[in-house]
Each structure stands twice: as structure tokens, then as C-alpha cells.
């Protein structure tokens, strides 16, 4: 019964989106509501974790049952809203507690005696990030994946003007030395996206959930040179131009985030005249 399943899931503090390897909603506006995709994910993972393939592995059998539970709840229109409300509130409280602990630790570190030697670069990075966290908390803004600081990724993001909207989440078959960045870049350029030029793939980074030695597939976030290139790759995939070694391609920022976007900005009068070729009167 879904009601009993929901109670058990909440008692165990389970994130069913993680179970199905789907994006976790951060608020009511970002709830993942693509039911066909949920069912496709279930079928793919159920084949991978089916007990018949792993009869002597209790953790795999448990994973298989969790997949069924997650699918039952996330595809049930009556039960899912209750679960989503609980999960969003639970994650908010958990993240607030963890973030406050980090902020407190940062404040204690910053208020301590200034050392005579130059601080370690990682400490400087954490201190700068702590300042950002406090600002985001003050203005009640979302703060993303603040637990994992990657200096190189942040530097790359700062150098690319459209880093996030040029990024696609690519699930592809695991391959030899897939955890090596240069090897992975070469694989993407020479084996996967062979119609693209080398400079159209700007950067890549890996999902922290990748298990390179055991999993059949891995997740690579691929940053293209422009949003137009990323859009071209995604549209090709969505229109049925499949790539044999690729299991899924999706935007880093889910499309439904923009489903109700209707912001209109009025042009400055001078710009409007330029667009319409009207003369600009000088004082």
C-alpha cells in the first residue's frame, strides 16, 4: 500500500529521487514531474539491479526493492505531493543545520589569531565561500552544492560566461580509465561527439556518485563552448539521433525550471530607437 510505503520511507529519511538517480527538487517549483522518464529510469535500473543477476548480494536485492518503492510513490498522484513536501522541508532543515555548522566553524577560524605564515590555499577558498554562504543565507537565496568546493571548476566557471546553461549531464557506458579527465575528454571528442570540433567541448567534470570500478555507466557533466552548441547536442539526442554508448543526455538546469518564465523587460528608449532606426535627438 502506498500509504504504508510512504510512512516507512519518511521514517527511514529516504531520498527517492536519489534512489532513481533523478534530480532532487529544492522547492515546490523544481519538482521533477516527468512521469515517463521516472518509469524509464525504473526499467533501466531494475534490469541492472535485478535479484536474478545478483542472488547472493543482499544490498543489491535491497536496492531493487527500493527502486519499486520509489517508483510506486513518485508515480502516485495522491501520495507523491505528501512525500515531496516532506522531502523539501527535511532537506531544507538538514542543509540549514549543516550550513550553520560550517558558518560557525568558519567564524571561529576567522576570529582566531592571525597566523604569521600564509594560510593554506584551501582555507582561503573556504573562508571566501563562507562569506558567500552568509550573504546567501541573509537574502534567503538557494546556495547549491556548497559542501563540495572545487577550485578548478569554479575557475573554469568564472572564465566561461554561460557555464551552467552550456552544460549537459551525459550518462554513458563506462570505459577504461574513465576517471581520468584528459582521457575522458579525448573519449568524448573522438568516440562520442565526433561531429563536433575539439574546441566545442570546453570542459568536463564528474559526478561524485560515479563508481568507476563497478558501475556499467558513469555521469559526466560536459560544458560546451556556447549554449547554442549544448542546445544542438541536446536537440539531436531528443529528436532520436541516438549515440550507441550514450544512455541519456539532459540539461544541467532542467527545462521545467523555465516552463512558466514570462519575464518581459521594457527596452530603454534610446535602445528602442536604435532597433527601429529612429534618429536620436541630442540635447
Curated annotation (Swiss-Prot):
It comes from the Eukaryota. The keyword Nucleus applies. GO terms for cellular component: cytoplasm; Prp19 complex; spliceosomal complex; U2-type spliceosomal complex. It is found in: Cytoplasm; Nucleus. Pfam families: DnaJ. Keywords: Chaperone, Cytoplasm, mRNA processing, mRNA splicing, Nucleus, Spliceosome. This is Pre-mRNA-splicing factor CWC23. Belongs to the CWC complex (or CEF1-associated complex), a spliceosome sub-complex reminiscent of a late-stage spliceosome composed of the U2, U5 and U6 snRNAs and at least BUD13, BUD31, BRR2, CDC40, CEF1, CLF1, CUS1, CWC2, CWC15, CWC21, CWC22, CWC23, CWC24, CWC25, CWC27, ECM2, HSH155, IST3, ISY1, LEA1, MSL1, NTC20, PRP8, PRP9, PRP11, PRP19, PRP21, PRP22, PRP45, PRP46, SLU7, SMB1, SMD1, SMD2, SMD3, SMX2, SMX3, SNT309, SNU114, SPP2, SYF1, SYF2, RSE1 and YJU2. Belongs to the DnaJ family. Residues 15-87 form the J domain. PROSITE patterns: DNAJ_1 (PS00636), DNAJ_2 (PS50076). PANTHER family: DNAJ HOMOLOG SUBFAMILY C MEMBER 17. Disulfide bonds: none annotated. Involved in pre-mRNA splicing. May be involved in endoplasmic reticulum-associated protein degradation (ERAD) and required for growth at low and high temperatures. The keyword Kinase does not apply. GO terms for biological process: mRNA splicing, via spliceosome; spliceosomal complex disassembly.
Amino acid at each position: 500500500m502506498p500509504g504504508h510505503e510512504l510512512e516507512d520511507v519518511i521514517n527511514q529519511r529516504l531520498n527517492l529521487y536519489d534512489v532513481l538517480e533523478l534530480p532532487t527538487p529544492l522547492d515546490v517549483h523544481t519538482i521533477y514531474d516527468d512521469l515517463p522518464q521516472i518509469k524509464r529510469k525504473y526499467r533501466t535500473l531494475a534490469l541492472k539491479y535485478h535479484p536474478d543477476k545478483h542472488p547472493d548480494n543482499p544490498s543489491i536485492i535491497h536496492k531493487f526493492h527500493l527502486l519499486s518503492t520509489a517508483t510506486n510513490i513518485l508515480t502516485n498522484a495522491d501520495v507523491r505531493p505528501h512525500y515531496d513536501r516532506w522531502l523539501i522541508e527535511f532537506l531544507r532543515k538538514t542543509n540549514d543545520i549543516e550550513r550553520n555548522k560550517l558558518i560557525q566553524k568558519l567564524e571561529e577560524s576567522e576570529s582566531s589569531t592571525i597566523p604569521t605564515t600564509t594560510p593554506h590555499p584551501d582555507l582561503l577558498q573556504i573562508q571566501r565561500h563562507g562569506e558567500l554562504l552568509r550573504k546567501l543565507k541573509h537574502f534567503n537565496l538557494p546556495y547549491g552544492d556548497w559542501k563540495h568546493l572545487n577550485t578548478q571548476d569554479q575557475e573554469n566557471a568564472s572564465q566561461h560566461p554561460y557555464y551552467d546553461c552550456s552544460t549537459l549531464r551525459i550518462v554513458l557506458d563506462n570505459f577504461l580509465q574513465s576517471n581520468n579527465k584528459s582521457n575522458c575528454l579525448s573519449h568524448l571528442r573522438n568516440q562520442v561527439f565526433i561531429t563536433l570540433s575539439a574546441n566545442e567541448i570546453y570542459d568536463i567534470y564528474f559526478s561524485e556518485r560515479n563508481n568507476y570500478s563497478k558501475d556499467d555507466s558513469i555521469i559526466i557533466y560536459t560544458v560546451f563552448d556556447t549554449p547554442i552548441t549544448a542546445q544542438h547536442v541536446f536537440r539531436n539526442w531528443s529528436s532520436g539521433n541516438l549515440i550507441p554508448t550514450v544512455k541519456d543526455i539532459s540539461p544541467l538546469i532542467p527545462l521545467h525550471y523555465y516552463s512558466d518564465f514570462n519575464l518581459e523587460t521594457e527596452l530603454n528608449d534610446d535602445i528602442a530607437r536604435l532597433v527601429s532606426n529612429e534618429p536620436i535627438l541630442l540635447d
